[in-house]
């Protein structure tokens, strides 16, 4: 079995899922094309990182689908001078994307294990 090509999967996610949902902001598409979504997921779900699915994180929490994350980032219209507060950061992927679009991001997560995993993913 061949290992999954995450780079190709990321490219296809943006071109076949996110962009068709009218996410056309080039900065948002660039961020979603480069930030490794799989790094923010439990190992058991990494092979589904680029599927059009909300994936379980534990504690009854789920990721947003990539198309929803793209729409949210586009709607925020973040500027490089903006400061962002993310409450309920979950796996940290959205905060990571925002961090590449804005000046500073403060992400809060009530579940310690999710916060630690998000911190680790953001440190990579």
Where are these regions (language model features)?
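A generic secondary-structure micro-motif detector
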Residues: 3-4, 62, 108
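N-terminal auxiliary segments of SAM/dcSAM-dependent transferases
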Residues: 1-44
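Alpha-helix N-capping/helix-start residues
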Residues: 25-26, 66, 112
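Glycine-rich loop at the start of a catalytic domain that most often binds anionic cofactors/ligands
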Residues: 44-45, 56
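Conserved alpha-helix/loop element of class I SAM-dependent methyltransferases that forms part
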Residues: 14-15, 19-20, 49-52, 59, ...
């Amino acid at each position: 079995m061949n290992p999954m090509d995450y780079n190709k999967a990321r490219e296809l996610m943006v071109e076949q899922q996110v962009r068709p949902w009218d996410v056309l902001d080039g900065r948002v598409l660039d961020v979603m094309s480069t930030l490794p979504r799989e790094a923010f997921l439990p190992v058991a779900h990494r092979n589904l990182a680029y599927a059009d699915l909300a994936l379980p994180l534990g504690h009854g929490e789920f990721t947003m689908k990539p198309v929803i994350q793209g729409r949210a980032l586009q709607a925020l219209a973040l500027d490089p001078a903006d400061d962002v507060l993310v409450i309920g950061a979950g796996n940290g992927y959205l905060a990571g994307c925002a961090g590449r679009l804005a000046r500073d991001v403060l992400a809060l997560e009530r579940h310690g294990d999710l916060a630690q995993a998000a911190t680790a993913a953001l440190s990579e």
